[in-house]
Design a protein with these regions (language model features):
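Short Gly/aromatic-enriched secondary-structure transition segments
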Residues: 35-42
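N-terminal cationic-hydrophobic initiation segments that often serve targeting/anchoring roles
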Residues: 43-46, 108
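Gly/Thr-rich phosphate-binding loop signature of adenosyl cofactor/nucleotide-binding cores
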Residues: 54
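Flexible, surface-exposed loop/gating regions in the mature catalytic domains
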Residues: 71-73
């Protein structure tokens, strides 16, 4: 019963996603981390677990974070957005790029008016370590 109640507090129904925000984990390039690691780091910061909806690892794995029907917790003021985290800082491998491309295309079909941006476009951060708008125009 407690789990159901806490899920109701966090659950936001069918969120109308308007943005997709791309992040990086700001971990050393090439080091393997995953969604479970990020979940643990976020808990250690006193947060409610992983704030991203999707994590893309250097091994080419797409891992689920929090469900998309839960509000994200990854960009202040923009948490009705899908959050994707690329593991690394500014050097991502071909597998990561391919997964990101496919995931963005899939989400743009699911949410036709979705605006795709980098974390640095809504915050004074260097995250995600690349120019998302250039990538969208030239690589998507």
């Amino acid at each position: 019963l407690l789990l159901v109640f806490s899920e109701l507090l966090i659950k936001s129904g069918n969120l109308k996603m308007k943005e997709l925000i791309i992040h990086c984990s700001a971990t050393p390039n090439g080091r393997y981390n995953n969604a479970a690691d990020i979940h643990q780091w976020h808990l250690e910061n006193g947060w409610d677990g992983i704030g991203y909806h999707w994590v893309i690892t250097p091994k080419g794995e797409l891992q689920a974070g929090r469900p998309e029907y839960w509000k994200g917790s990854h960009a202040r003021g923009h948490n009705n957005a899908i959050g994707i985290c690329m593991i690394g800082t500014d050097e991502f491998n071909d597998e990561q790029w391919a997964i990101l491309r496919n995931l963005v295309l899939k989400k743009k079909i699911e949410y036709p008016n979705l605006k795709v941006i980098g974390h640095n476009e809504v915050s004074t951060k260097s995250c995600p370590g690349f120019d998302v708008q250039w990538w969208l125009k030239n690589k998507l």
